[in-house]
Amino acid sequence: MSKNTSDLSSHTPMMQQYWRLKNQHPDQLMFYRMGDFYEIFYEDAKKAAKLLDITLTARGQSAGQAIPMCGIPYHAAEGYLAKLVKLGESVVICEQVGDPATSKGPVERQVVRIITPGTVSDEALLDERRDNLIAAVLGDERLFGLAVLDITSGNFSVLEIKGWENLLAELERINPVELLIPDDWPQGLPAEKRRGVRRRAPWDFERDSAHKSLCQQFSTQDLKGFGCETLTLAIGAAGCLLSYAKETQRTALPHLRSLRHERLDDTVVLDGASRRNLELDTNLAGGRDNTLQSVVDRCQTAMGSRLLTRWLNRPLRDLKVLEARQSSITCLLDGYRFERLQPQLKEIGDIERILARIGLRNARPRDLARLRDALAALPELQEAMTELEATHLNQLAATTSTYPELAALLAKAIIDNPPAVIRDGGVLKTGYDAELDELQSLSENAGQFLIDLEAREKARTGLANLKVGYNRIHGYFIELPSKQAEQAPADYIRRQTLKGAERFITPELKEFEDKALSAKSRALAREKMLYDALLETLISHLPPLQDTAGALAELDVLSNLAERALNLDLNCPRFVSEPCMRITQGRHPVVEQVLTTPFVANDLSLDDNTRMLVITGPNMGGKSTYMRQTALIVLLAHIGSFVPAASCELSLVDRIFTRIGSSDDLAGGRSTFMVEMSETANILHNATERSLVLMDEVGRGTSTFDGLSLAWAAAERLAHLRAYTLFATHYFELTVLPESEPLVANVHLNATEHNERIVFLHHVLPGPASQSYGLAVAQLAGVPSAVITRAREHLSRLETTSLPHEVAPQAPGKPSVPQQSDMFASLPHPVLDDLAKLDLDDMTPRRALEMLYTLKTRI
């Protein structure tokens, strides 16, 4: 199809209508309603057929060309939409809004909804345990305004961020499925490397119009009440988001009631690398198994799980909030009160998203049935909440209201097990509306009328093979075999000829058809009108209902954390004002669940006298586990949770950094070592004396001297910054750091060898490791025994011939390269001698190349 569709005169009327709508949405797939199917045309059809693995065919011709087409049944659209959304596609839903019986030309069609990955609300298209976020960003390299919206809950927030680095870290945290940026931004910016980036017109971000639309949405004169009146960039981004949401939903958004101003200074910041390394809610393979959330999430509701995920990804530095959560968990543990609450919370379900769909006016009948059941369960839950003494739990109880009138209305209106959609009726109870009952009675009694009519006609005509039936195309009919058609009475009017049969209509049957079909269509229309009125009633109660949902989600998280504290042997950490991090018998919460043997717990102590631990020991000895468990304990403490330790005393931290493991960034053109150095640079630039830093094997991706020098200098820098640092290394030379840096101490993970086999003991002990056990680990990994034997020979020779291991402490501030055993010092090569004698200044390029080839042959 030609890309130029501005001249539609050569197209058929149907295709003219299609292109008028399609030209408004050139970059989105259009589902075009044709009877019982959504049909997809032209380039959209080719793309959809490939993505959905459905047949590509053709639908006649228009403008002299065949029309590529594929289609799906309208009643099965959800599954196909879910697949497209997961693939990052956006879909325009175009429905028939006119009456085919009265339409002249093509039936009128309109775009009723645009489904994009960030604005879907249908239950079938969403992951119930994860937020589905869309974000918009505005600004320059110095300052950015970021707005974030979850249309499935109504959560709407803004913040302003300094610099690309912090912006990208925040985007990594929230992980939006769509990101809106101004169309006048240059191409190739860092944010565009993310999935789902969509460019919007610059005027969509204009501050004054954004401010006006936000005030209209929230029915306020200004945004001062939300604390964001002066956030010019963030307001522009929020205005763009609101406009996009309205454009895609094609309806009012009453469930968007407020704007929350978030501040990075209130949180513990984790960059993208740290978030990935700690495997908070996604493991390194992209799954959810063996993540922190997989261990600490036993929430009874999906909305509780989503809130817990937010907490894990946004630890707080607000001591008042953290201590309120701790007190709540303690209260819920007292007398095992959480055990009474959790079954009741399970009855509540995911009312947060149900209420959002009600606000969007696309709630399904089963949504209302679930809301009915939740409202019925509220009084008993509220009664249980009143028995809780903790101040914060009392506040949640006060926010949780009961709604007896709404509960009674829904109980009266919705049948016990309603169908999935309102379209075919059968949702509202008999007795809810007298007029609907009358219409349904007339329609439903049609079957008995047809049975009686068939019996009467058989008796009247004497034709035993006579049948009375109905189909959607031709309506009601009397059918006779072709051989008996000539015996039909005179009042039988021929309606349809089939192979082997004739169909007729009689005046009596025609009169009934008019009444029955009219009654059915009027009943469906009446039921849809009553259902919409029910939604409007619920929408008028949205604000308190949403507040209740928010309170119950938090109660679910706190009850869950109490249950986890009991069953995982977690204890309450204590925040103190003096700088310290003291953990007794700390454990890795994920690893200990996977092990079939008891986990070896370890202590940690950092304070003003010791700010860095240099950790040595064998591979697989537990260094990385020890470091990660420290970070996870600190993180859990900063969401208000109890922690996997016998005791924990710590001061608030501002950031958690990890430099653990690396892989190539092939798409970005960065090697493993480059990735490692980028992460190290980020830490050295941004760590403070309140940061927790984990550094594992820094410098291993380059030559020995380069790597050692970089690791040494990085460790010195962190010691001078006074950051809480765990520095794991195989460079034994670094164990002399405490001699020049008084805030540094050595610890090691112990192991022992028995019959040339290594046994890892996993205990963290003071002082440096005595040896590395590298060959024993290689043997354990299955390296061939011949290779191990040969390696032992090389090791013995190198240990004998190398220079003694000796490093002189260097005064701070003086440039130095740490000295190390030069394992090749006793192995001179004649090529090196010849190379040193060459006079490169007097050598022509050709001669240099010839010499290079000659030297190469001698290596």
UniProtKB/Swiss-Prot annotation:
One of its GO terms (biological process) is mismatch repair. Signal peptide: none annotated. InterPro entries: DNA_mismatch_repair_MutS, DNA_mismatch_repair_MutS-lik_N, DNA_mismatch_repair_MutS/MSH, DNA_mismatch_repair_MutS_C, DNA_mismatch_repair_MutS_clamp, DNA_mismatch_repair_MutS_core, DNA_mismatch_repair_MutS_N, DNA_mismatch_repair_MutS_sf. The keyword DNA repair applies. GO terms for molecular function: ATP binding; ATP-dependent DNA damage sensor activity; damaged DNA binding; mismatched DNA binding. GO terms for cellular component: cytosol. It comes from the Bacteria. The keyword Disulfide bond does not apply. Residues 801-820 are annotated as: Disordered. ATP binds at G617, P618, N619, M620, G621, G622, K623, S624. Keywords: ATP-binding, DNA damage, DNA repair, DNA-binding, Nucleotide-binding. This protein is involved in the repair of mismatches in DNA. It is possible that it carries out the mismatch recognition step. This protein has a weak ATPase activity. Belongs to the DNA mismatch repair MutS family. NCBIfam families: mutS1, PRK05399.1. This is DNA mismatch repair protein MutS. It comes from Pseudomonas fluorescens (strain ATCC BAA-477 / NRRL B-23932 / Pf-5). The gene is mutS.
